[in-house]
Amino acid sequence: MSTPAHELCRLGLREAGAGVAAKAISSSELVEASLARIQATDGKLGAFLAVSADRARAAARAADARAARGERRSELDGVPVAVKDLFVTKGVPTTAGSRILEGWLPPYDATVVERLEAAGAVIVGKLNMDEFAMGSSNENSAYKPCHNPWDLSRTPGGSSGGSAASVAAGQVHASLGTDTGGSIREPAAFCGVVGVKPTYGRVSRYGVVAFASSLDQVGPLAREVGDAALVLRTIAGHDPRDMTSSTRPVDDYLAPLEDGARGLRVGVPREWLSGGLDAGVEAAVRAALDTYRRLGATLVDVSLPHSKYGIGAYYLIAPAEASSNLARYDGVRFGLRAADAKGLKEMYAESRERGLGAEPKRRIMLGTYALSSGYYDAYYLRAQKVRTLIRRDFDEAFRGCDVIAGPVTPSVAFKLGERTGDPLRMYLADIFTITCNLAALPGLSVPCGLEAASGLPVGLQLVGRPFDEATLFRAARALERELGPLPAPPEP
């Protein structure tokens, strides 16, 4: 008897892959279930910007043919996934959530897309996002907002909102996002899934539309810790096409996954729990920390004294890099062009005026100002010095602990439209996640329960030493195993 489509959509990634390998289910069945789920739910969710049904069906048939021959490329072989629309995909529209790239068909695939497809994963489409990854609510998408599966009136988080919502709603078994200041971890927390921002350089950025090149990093989102670990193991590793990618060997993240929390030293930054948190979020985070203590971990008080300056430093460094990266969108080589402009300068100005949204324009202005003559030392250079101090704080903290734990966000998912008129309040949603990017460290969000008042998910953030994602997965899995999975969100 075949498995009902809705049950196929809720399978874990590894479980689905094992079913294909055992010929208990086919990749084609999984893909058809995924496509049907997208068609049935995405009118309300808005998680997808493009669905590649024909390409996905062809990949599924190829996976089924391999299974029939007893071949298996990896544990992902034949499983439907999706990627944020920031990754270039050959022949498939890539917009970065912006009108200025509407209709652009890239001539090549991003490295992470190549690696997923080489592993046999079936990419069913491209996911909604804040324009050029600039935002914390997915409301900056030039095409449509994305909605949180737990409550359609709320944000899924940003900028990888579609990546989190699609996984939480069972549209796909895993997804890829990017994280520049919390853009994987915040949506993961808001949508009740696992989201991983790896160490800077662990995953190639080749073929990723750049926002802030010293901060951007690619990572997975999944419903289970082990599934996220498997996807990261698949996409990680050196890429000669990305000069910032590390040559350090990739660990087997699944090997220590079930080692438990006993013996781990969990650092708890006093600055992260000293105010500014909603009561329900703080209660869930403290309960998760108590769970670690019961499981045999030691809680260690640590200090990150310069973390309070992280928002200020980030919103000087990231816009400065964005003002340079986004200069290429001028109507000359690709993207929107103001064909009615009279002269070259007017074409530049009109193409950017019509093609870029309010948030990219705001950040370009911030960055250009920070880099301008007479202000560079006062703003940008000082922000880089603060970045160094933040990195040193983490170095000192890790002298006495193995992982650092705390909240991902100050609140659960907020209402759509609630903060769009107040950019500063929106920026503060990333107050606990930004320092991880500034210090180039790996970070992870794992569900730690539901807020009592709202019934919405709360995420626990775990931060590790450089390239020690394996310990993060071990710690996250220990909590996941003890607390059990969250219930599925309501049907849209």
Curated annotation (Swiss-Prot):
Keywords: ATP-binding, Ligase, Nucleotide-binding, Protein biosynthesis
Gene (UniProt): gatA
InterPro entries in the cross-refs: Amidase, Amidase_CS, Amidase_dom, AS_sf, GatA
Keyword Nuclease attached: no
Gene Ontology MF term list: ATP binding; glutaminyl-tRNA synthase (glutamine-hydrolyzing) activity
Broadest EC class assigned to this enzyme: ligase
HAMAP family: GatA
Keyword Ligase recorded: yes
Catalytic center residues: K84 (charge relay system), S159 (charge relay system), S183 (acyl-ester intermediate)
SUPFAM superfamilies xrefs: Amidase signature (AS) enzymes (SSF75304)
Gene3D superfamilies reported in the protein's UniProt record: Amidase signature (AS) domain (3.90.1300.10)
Subunit structure comment from the entry: Heterotrimer of A, B and C subunits.
GO biological process annotation, one example: translation
Coiled-coil residue windows: none
Function description: Allows the formation of correctly charged Gln-tRNA(Gln) through the transamidation of misacylated Glu-tRNA(Gln) in organisms which lack glutaminyl-tRNA synthetase. The reaction takes place in the presence of glutamine and ATP through an activated gamma-phospho-Glu-tRNA(Gln).
Assigned GO CC terms: glutamyl-tRNA(Gln) amidotransferase complex
The enzyme's E.C. designation: 6.3.5.7
Protein name as catalogued: Glutamyl-tRNA(Gln) amidotransferase subunit A
Catalytic activity: L-glutamyl-tRNA(Gln) + L-glutamine + ATP + H2O = L-glutaminyl-tRNA(Gln) + L-glutamate + ADP + phosphate + H(+)
Family recorded in the similarity comment: Belongs to the amidase family. GatA subfamily.
Domain of life: Bacteria
Signal peptide: none
